[in-house]
Amino acid sequence: MTLPLPQVIPCVDIQSGRAVRLYEGDPDRETVYFDSPRAAARHWVTLGAGFLHLVDLDAATGRGENRAVIAEIVRELGVPVEVGGGVRDRAAAQSLLTAGVARVVIGTAAVRNPELVAELIAEYGPERVVVSLDARGLEVATHGWAAGSGVSVADLTPRLAEAGLRTLIFTDVTRDGTLRGLDRDLMRQVRGLWHGELIVGGGVADTNDVRLLAEEGIEGAIVGRAIYEGTLPYPVRL
């Protein structure tokens, strides 16, 4: 039986106005792939991407923000994008959604204030609100991955389901940007904890990882370094 191909979503991480990739989420260990995030986004759309994942790393770490660049990408490229990084309150989420972003990605705020997720879903609908749980093992990391939260994925997922969340992003921060490949056991655990749409980030290295996701019934992956450096050819074909 042929398994459905998981959706592979190109990621554009934006730091100091450039498209970069971080090693294990460390803002001081960056690789610059494009001097212009707009050029990076345009590159993936030209290759056939129908959806993009943008992360404002400066907003996530409190070092600034890149909202103007993100707004330009949304206006110019004509494909839906989701945006995360520093979306910690209602005003930040509303600003992005009213600017034309297809959906916002809530990270730290979903851990600290799950009610915010429910409020945004009630106002904008579950198709426009996504939660990203960035974790070391099954402990959620917060504030640009710099801190452990003491909250487990197992504790949080039932509350998110109750809030009406449909789509969850899970990132293994210990593998993000490393090309080490996915941890199958961890992926299986998370799949068992979340019964809605599950998108995985962090560690996808090649087609073997895409097959792993298909085998575990995971709907998609956000991929950065592997497609920028060519270890996973894009568009992906198995």
Swiss-Prot record:
One of its GO terms (cellular component) is cytoplasm. CDD domains: HisA. Keywords: Amino-acid biosynthesis, Cytoplasm, Histidine biosynthesis, Isomerase. It is found in: Cytoplasm. Its EC number is 5.3.1.16. The keyword Isomerase applies. InterPro entries: Aldolase_TIM (IPR013785), His_biosynth (IPR006062), HisA_bact_arch (IPR006063), Isoase_HisA-like (IPR044524), Isoase_HisA-like_bact (IPR023016), RibuloseP-bd_barrel (IPR011060). The active site is at D13 (proton acceptor), D134 (proton donor). Its main location: cytoplasm. GO terms for molecular function: 1-(5-phosphoribosyl)-5-[(5-phosphoribosylamino)methylideneamino]imidazole-4-carboxamide isomerase activity. Pfam families: His_biosynth (PF00977). It catalyses: 1-(5-phospho-beta-D-ribosyl)-5-[(5-phospho-beta-D-ribosylamino)methylideneamino]imidazole-4-carboxamide = 5-[(5-phospho-1-deoxy-D-ribulos-1-ylimino)methylamino]-1-(5-phospho-beta-D-ribosyl)imidazole-4-carboxamide. This is 1-(5-phosphoribosyl)-5-[(5-phosphoribosylamino)methylideneamino] imidazole-4-carboxamide isomerase. It comes from Deinococcus radiodurans (strain ATCC 13939 / DSM 20539 / JCM 16871 / CCUG 27074 / LMG 4051 / NBRC 15346 / NCIMB 9279 / VKM B-1422 / R1).
